[in-house]
Amino acid sequence: MSKNLFEECEKCLHDEPAASTAWCPVHVDVPLFASEMEKGDFKKAYQVLEKKIPFTGIIGMICDHPCEKACVRDKLDRAINVSELERAAVRYGYTPFKKGPSMPKKKGKVAVVGGGISGITAAFELDRKGFQVTIYEQSERLGGRVWDYEGKRISREAIEEELQIIERLGIKVSYDSRIGEEELEQLTEEYDAVYLGTGEWEKGLYIHPDTFQVFDSPLFAGGRLYDKSGSVIYAVSSGKRAALSMERYIKKISLTASREREGSFETSLNYQLGDVEPAPRIEKIHDVYTEDEAVREAKRCLKCRCSECVKTCSHMQKFNVTPKGYGRQIQINESVIMGTRYANKMINSCAMCGLCAEQCSLGIGMKDLIHETRESMVEKSKMPPSAHDFALKDMEFSNSNRFFMVKPPPGDKKAEYLFYPGCQLSASCPEYVEKAYRYLLSSVKEGVGIMLGCCGAPADWAGRKDLMRESIERFKNVWNETGKPAFILACSSCIGIFEKYLPEISYVSLWEIFQKYGLPETAKPEHRHILNIHDACGTRHKKEVHESVRKLASGLGYEIEELKYAKDKTKCCGYGGLVYYANREQAIDFAEDRIRESKADLLVYCAMCKDLFVSQGKRTFHILELIFGENPEDAARKKMPNLSQRHANRAGLKTRLLRELWGEEPEMELMERNELNLVIPQELWKTMEERYLLLEDIEQVVARSRISGERFFNPEDSSYLASLRIKNVTYWVRYAEKEGEIHVISAYSHRMEVVKE
């Protein structure tokens, strides 16, 4: 598998920090903090602060909030008032510091000169790392300029309570210790590392901007010695970062490795405001937000996170994954040699529609990775047979003699075009395929032949490279044998296959042909209602297809209202990627998600889109119903044929075309059916659909059992139970014979083979 595709997934921005978090020098998770505040859980909000900020009861009250300058909301109205939210979290969620289990002290002792904000932060961090710490403070109390805020933003009692943390940790403090140049030099000899946080120093110091080391020595410095702005939170940051450097220095490891994102930095996350409505900042009535005010202000936070692809994808929402997480789960799944591959169902539930790449600012998408993964699963014999078996058998049927056909125009005229309607349109609306071909014969003077069959999309989606190669070779052979005509395509999946695998063959959509040669006379324009167009995901980048369908609908008198996700941003109906067969529940989620977006009736130009939307109760028109339908309004609720009818419709289309246009009778294989008078209850038809059982499967089981006599008889109800293995599936049918009719009672299938002795 391609390493590059996994590397692309790793570039996913979903886990990138919000701009406010990135610009906060200690990287408080602002969205998480705001989320807890919004819920009114002030204790949890306080804990979020406490994870990044020591002496939270002090710093939370006096933080100078540089994060607000980076707040994305500031581009719309005003930044979130993080400063006041912090103060509210301290006021309503304050929890006294709890000393954790004491760590064994490491071989190493450090000194901290200056008991101000950066100094006590460095001491706190170094103690947590297990070092023996001594603070040298020139005055009689710790805190430094914290005391400047006494009575203004914080009480004396609150300051004293928080500063007791130093004593409770057992950190030594030497008060009234004035340290000058000479004393500092002695400390650097006595201790393994020394932190200088005095705010001022008589001699100029070169402090490394990343490590806070002073020259190449055991001395480190921060606070106002490094940042002249006097920022409280930057003082905290410098103390934390210097403590890490001191630990590395003592351990004799790199001071600079893996430190690119310490301190303030610009995130790669580019949060889109999109439809976000302005919301005025909540103003406080008293010195601190009330609980209600804090909750309302926290609600203004956008909780910035890149979820553009997830927001539009039912699949990623259902499995709770992002491209990065998806890629990692695939790697784990691929590495399993023995045991269960838990990601198989997820991998087979992706529609491979490509919307994720369109939504991503970096163009990261799952389509190609999922495709390669499925191919890999097939090659390693790890693809569950049940996932795509029916779809591949359906494709096999479409390319068998029962449907496949290539014919020149009647009268053996030369054809510059070859009409290829595809297998699904022929199964869902065979009458419109026939009408469309008759239209082409009468309107396109260059001559139009016809080819029936399946383009191979199911094989491509299923990761079956062998079957896909056969399909491509079939197309190339037909194209060469018929004089290299241009194909007229009526299926968006076919368009996708031609774009991907057959670049040498020119094609045009049926909708563009209608636009070029004009609509049939029966399609009379009249004033009609509003429609929302759902673009097929297979035509995502085919602007000419999008425009031609819209012009056709407008020409027929319909008013078009665009969906939010249209054209190159369209969503999948739920059939793409064979999701309909691998995970029916996921396919329905796709369909319902799209339906929720539409307020008017839908207009589609893909047969499966039509069938899936109607199956979920949405009035939906296929463009051919508007062009050829005698009563288009009735067609909006026309339900999809069942699986057995779809086979019959394809075979019937071929039969009619051969007889009516060429005066030919179909081959015997096409006409061969078991002469059985089967009676199947409606409820059983539904079960057969859910279990992918075809009428012809039932017929074969019953017919074979009656001929061979291999069946079980139940004297209680005079019913028979028979089985038959067809290829890789064993079918079971329970039936009863009554007055010349065969009443089918139940049917099911499995992949186990019944061995007869």
Which residues does each PLM region occupy?
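Cofactor-cradling patches in redox/metallo enzymes
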Residues: 150-152, 424-509, 540-557, 561-657
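Ferredoxin-type iron-sulfur electron-transfer modules and their immediate structural context
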Residues: 1-102, 193-349
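Short, charged, surface-exposed secondary-structure boundary motifs
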Residues: 145-146, 205-207, 515-522, 571-573, ...
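Conserved beta-strand elements of the Class I
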Residues: 111-113, 220, 418, 532, ...
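Ribonuclease/tRNase effector modules and their secretory precursors
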Residues: 637-645, 649, 654-757
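Local cysteine-cluster metal-coordination motifs and their immediate loop/turn environment
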Residues: 7-31, 55-76, 299-318, 348-363, ...
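C-terminal amphipathic alpha-helical segment
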Residues: 519-555
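Iron-sulfur-cluster electron-transfer modules
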Residues: 34-192, 197, 320-503, 644-659
